[in-house]
Amino acid sequence: MDSELKEEIPVHEEFILCGGAETQVLKCGPWTDLFNDQSVKRPKLLIFIIPGNPGFSAFYVPFAKALYSLTNRCFPVWTISHAGHALAPKDKKILTTSEDSNAQEIKDIYGLNGQIEHKLAFLRTHVPKDMKLVLIGHSVGSYFTLQMLKRVPELPVIRAFLLFPTIERMSESPNGRIATPLLCWSRYVLYVTGYLLLKPCPEKIKSLLIRRGLQVMNLENEFSPLNILEPFCLANAAHLGGQEMMEVVKRDDETIREHLCKLTFYYGTIDPWCPKEYYEDIKKDFPEGDIRLCEKNIPHAFIIHFNQEMADMIADSLKDDLSKM
C-alpha cells in the first residue's frame, strides 16, 4: 500500500537558468509555480532540500516523496541541483525568468561561494518573499544552509535541518584526508582522465551503466541522472569538493548561535566525513541546541537505503510547526 501511495505522488521536473547556470529542480506535489500562484489554495510553506556533493537532485526524489507523504501532502517539497551538476537533455526546454535574465552573473558559480549565491538567487526568483521555508541541507548542503541564514537573515525560515553536516574541519576528517590530495592537487589529472574515458562513450552505454548502478544502490531512476557520467558535471563536482576541503574549516559558531532555536543537527555514528567527535564538540559548546546523534547506524549517504527513516525523523520534528500553518 505504501509503495502504491508513493507512485501516485506527482513529481515535476524543470530545468531553469539560475544565476547563469543550468539547474535541475524537482518539485514534489501539484504546485509548480509558487511565485505566480495567487489562489487561496497556495501553500504557505515550502520544504526546500539542498543536496550534498555531487548535487544530483534526482538522488533525493525517494526522500522528497516520503517527506511529502508524511506531511499529509499539504506542502511542496522541492529539491535543487547544484549549479553545473545537471545539464538539460537536448529535448528539454530551459526556463528563464525576467529577474534571472537581468541578474548579475554569479562569480565562480560552480565554487563554494557561488553555490550559496545560486541557492539564494533561486529563492529570490522562484519563491514568494512571504512564504515560510523549511530548509534541509545534507552534507555540504548543511554548510550552504548556514551561510544562507548568515547572508540573508530575513529569510522566513521556520526550521532548518542539517543532516550529516560537513560544516567544519572537512580536510581533517577520515574521508577528507583521502579526498584532499585528490581534489586539490590531482584534480586536473582526474579531469583529463574523465574526458578521455567518458566523452567518447555513447549515451546508450552511459545510460545502461547508470541504470545498473542505481539498481544496485536501490535508487529510483524516475529521473535518470545521466550527469553522473558527464565530464562537465564531474569536473564541477570536483572543483566544488576541492574548495570544500580548503575552506570548510572553522565552524561558524556566531551564525549557529544566532539561529540556534530553528536549527536541528543530525550527526552519524559511522560518518567518515564528520566523525562522532565533531558531534561531541558542538554538543558541548551548544548544550541547549537540538543536536542529535543517530542511533540507527544510518550512513552519511542516507539517500541510498534510509530515505524513509530520515523523512520520519524530520516529519515528526515538524509536527508542531506545520500544525500552525
From Swiss-Prot:
Catalytic activity: a cholesterol ester + H2O = cholesterol + a fatty acid + H(+)
Gene Ontology molecular function: any one: sterol ester esterase activity
The enzyme's E.C. designation: 3.1.1.13
Compartments where found: Lipid droplet; Endoplasmic reticulum
KW Kinase (keyword) present: no
The keyword Hydrolase belongs to this UniProt entry's keyword annotation: yes
Gene Ontology biological process terms in this record: cholesterol homeostasis; intracellular triglyceride homeostasis; lipid droplet fusion; lipid storage
A GO CC annotation given for this chain: endoplasmic reticulum
InterPro entries on file: AB_hydrolase_fold, LDAH
Active site location: 139 (nucleophile), 271 (charge relay system), 300 (charge relay system)
Xref: SUPFAM superfamilies: alpha/beta-Hydrolases
Superkingdom, taxonomy of origin: Eukaryota
Alphabetical keyword list: Endoplasmic reticulum, Hydrolase, Lipid droplet
Class of the enzyme per the UniProt entry, highest EC level: hydrolase
Function recorded in the entry: Probable serine lipid hydrolase associated with lipid droplets. Has low cholesterol esterase activity. Appears to lack triglyceride lipase activity. Involved in cholesterol and triglyceride homeostasis; stimulates cellular triglyceride accumulation and cellular cholesterol release. Acts antagonistically with PNPLA2/ATGL in regulation of cellular lipid stores. May regulate triglyceride accumulation indirectly through stimulation of PNPLA2/ATGL ubiquitination and proteasomal degradation. Promotes microtubule-dependent lipid droplet fusion.
Similarity field: Belongs to the AB hydrolase superfamily. LDAH family.
PANTHER family (UniProt xref): LIPASE, LIPID DROPLET-ASSOCIATED HYDROLASE
Protein name: Lipid droplet-associated hydrolase
Gene (UniProt): LDAH
